[in-house]
Amino acid sequence: DILEIDRINRYGEKGGMPATCWNCKTPKMVQWIKQYGDDFWAKDFNQFRTEVTDDDSIGCATCHNAETMQLQLYSEPLKDYLKSVGKDPAKLPRSEMRSLVCAQCHVEYYFNDPGHGPTKRPVFPWKNGFTPEAIYSVYEDNGNVDMPGFKGKFADWVHPVSQTPMLKMQHPDYETWIDGPHGAAGVACADCHMPYQREEGKKMSSHWWTSPLRDPELRACRQCHADKTAAYLRGRIEYTQDKTYK
């Protein structure tokens, strides 16, 4: 979809957005980072438009080693975070990887301002924790020191009418999960959204990435909540979701 939206200019030579926007859209990121290093991020998005085909979208290589099919991470900002907390991305247990492959993209992030590292390199703002308050505290002192009236504080964009610097919270799914009851219980993202199934006698993860509610029997939920009916679980989930949305 990123090739078809008008937020990124698809009608001219310049896209008007940094190449960072490719980070969660194609595993070709591995190739580009090897080729350009940190110079890649601040390049124009449209410079790479012709290098991507339909086969280069999110796929097997986003989460798997192409030779062994073991889970692996390609996301530079996620690997940066893991290294900062003393974890080797290549030596993590499978139970943790079944959520971290999702955390490559389903997260809050920001693009580095000059003076805080490679320009436009994506960063996951987790150094103080995963709560909204912890994430906001990172934005208090990682911004453009030259921005009038907002010196030192980070802003994703400036409102064109009021000229007010703004934050744009993306999609903090991993952060919501890890601080929620399922994350605390050690339930992985894939346990609910890619539950195990059997095909021709083999156990494998479903690759229909969707809500467990799409299954009338709620089999993903009942792997753990075996004493509850599908109707009860559906009602409980919808009650919680409705309360949250309101």
Question: What is each of the regions a protein language model found here?
Answer:
Residues 16-17, 26, 53-56:
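Active-site-adjacent structural elements in enzyme catalytic domains
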Residues 21-24, 32-33, 37:
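Glycine-rich active-site/cofactor-binding loop and its immediate structural neighborhood
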Residues 1, 34-62, 66-191, 195-246:
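Primarily the internal scaffold of c-type cytochrome electron-transfer domains
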